[in-house]
A protein has these predicted regions:
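Paired small-residue
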Residues: 97-100, 108-117, 305-313
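Cytoplasmic helix-loop-helix junction between adjacent transmembrane helices
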Residues: 113-151
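C-terminal transmembrane helical hairpin of 12-TM major facilitator-type secondary transporters
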Residues: 281-325
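Structural signature of the two symmetry-related core transmembrane helices
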Residues: 85-99, 281-296, 377
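Helix-breaking motifs and short loop linkers at transmembrane-helix boundaries and internal kinks
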Residues: 49, 81, 103-109, 300-302
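A late C-terminal transmembrane helix in Major Facilitator Superfamily
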Residues: 332-368, 376
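Helix-loop-helix hairpin linking two adjacent transmembrane segments in secondary transporters
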Residues: 107-109, 137-194, 241
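Helix-to-loop junctions at the C-terminal end of transmembrane segments
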Residues: 69-82, 267-279, 363-364
């Protein structure tokens, strides 16, 4: 009896473009939801009658949901449930959680709904990346995964500014209603254009969980958890920094977020090209350049034009860390590729939680609106130190 063929090896009865585009729409939805709370943090705080640092806990709650949710979903469901079915369930859950946020009217219910919304985040990207790679085949898998992930980056350019604008003009809940609507369209797109992929016979919980013993994988994840946190220490409070310190009109915030997102798109693509040449040097370069960008920004935030330029520079330098670390994880994760893919997003959202928490902490201790930028500088250096330790451990492991 013939063995089942994968979609990439059997006659194609689907559009690769539409399949990956459908997955990217889900990434756009998740990216919009993840960042919109940062753009609307002042509106949320005012409406719920809490302080801006207290509203920052909603950002941390979402990020912690990602950290906690991805590993068990991937390890348990990822080994048993068909990937298309899993993607549909994850996005349905995501849309409902965002609708619950829009309906929440107390700080406690918003906090819980944001945590719940974060649970399927990492699993969606982990499974979506594997689906994109399998559909494209070995010769195009890297570009397919990059295209799927582009939905997240494009969200920072289009989705977040649009959701922020909606929240400012129609109430902050409109931003989350927008995200829930995108989740609904993602469900339709994935159901219609992503083909069914059978569960691999070799997939097992044991194989994935074995990766938890890999020290090189954990150190690489730690680089992202610390080094990427600097972006969120600033991004989480960019709205009050611009309005309270730079003294710009709040209507400028969506424009600043869009330019930050453009920097992220350019930086991510440039870092990907450089990583093909030398992966480890690219990661080092990203961490050093981002540290420099934070220092530059700390001195240039008093003027509207230099402030927006500084935010563009931070986005340009920091975003390259994501794809480069994902590629490094492929090199060090061994047989636990699926778990590593999901844990990468857990690490980045741990960075989200850490950055938002530390940024809020320095603000709550009256250290000034520029203090979150210096937090970013410290976290970038911390990520660099961990990376150098990872290189040393990897070298010692290879000699052993």
């Amino acid at each position: 009896m013939a063995s089942p063929q994968s979609p990439s090896s059997s006659p194609r009865h689907y559009s690769l473009f539409l399949a990956i585009f459908s997955l990217a729409v889900g990434g756009f939805c998740i990216g919009t939801t993840e960042f919109v709370a940062m753009g609307l943090i002042q509106e949320i705080a005012h409406n719920l009658k809490i302080t801006v640092p207290e509203a920052g806990h909603f950002i941390s709650a979402y990020a912690l949901g990602v950290v906690i949710g991805a590993p068990p979903i991937i390890a348990i469901l990822g080994a048993k449930v068909p990937r298309k079915t899993l993607l549909l369930c994850l996005m349905l859950f995501y849309g409902i959680a965002n609708a619950c946020t829009a309906l929440a009217h107390t700080p406690e219910t918003v906090l819980v709904s944001r945590f719940i919304a974060g649970l399927p985040h990492g699993a969606y990207f982990g499974v979506g990346a594997l689906v994109a790679a399998e559909l494209a085949g070995p010769s195009r898998r890297a570009s397919a995964v990059a295209q799927m992930m582009m939905g997240l980056t494009v969200a920072t350019v289009i989705g977040v500014p649009l959701a922020t604008w909606l929240g400012q003009h129609f109430g902050w809940r409109a931003g989350f209603e927008f995200s829930a609507t995108i989740a609904f369209f993602t469900l339709i797109a994935v159901a219609c254009f992503v083909p069914n992929i059978p569960v691999q016979a070799t997939a097992s919980i044991k194989t994935e969980l074995a990766g938890l013993k890999n020290i090189n994988m954990w150190l690489t994840l730690a680089v992202g958890a610390i080094g990427f946190g600097g972006m969120f220490s600033v991004y989480s409070y960019v709205s009050p920094i611009l309005t309270e310190y730079t003294k710009v009109n709040i209507q400028i915030v969506p424009i600043a977020l869009a330019l930050w997102g453009i920097g992220m798109v350019i930086g991510g693509l440039a870092a990907g090209w450089l990583a093909d040449k030398n992966l480890n040097k690219t990661i080092v370069g990203v961490l050093i350049s981002s540290a420099i960008a934070f220092v530059v920004a700390s001195f240039l935030m008093s003027n509207i034009y230099s402030a927006i330029g500084s935010l563009f520079l931070i986005g340009l330098t920091v975003m390259g860390l994501g794809g480069a670390l994902q590629t490094r994880l492929m090199d060090v994760a061994g047989d636990a590729q699926t778990l590593a893919a999901s844990l990468n997003h857990s690490a980045f959202n741990l960075a989200n939680a850490l950055g938002a928490f530390l940024g809020g902490w320095v603000l709550s201790h009256q250290m000034g609106w520029i203090a979150p930028i210096w937090v970013g500088f410290v976290l970038s250096l911390g990520g660099l130190i961990i990376l150098l330790i990872a290189f040393a451990v990897e070298k010692a492991t290879q000699k052993a």
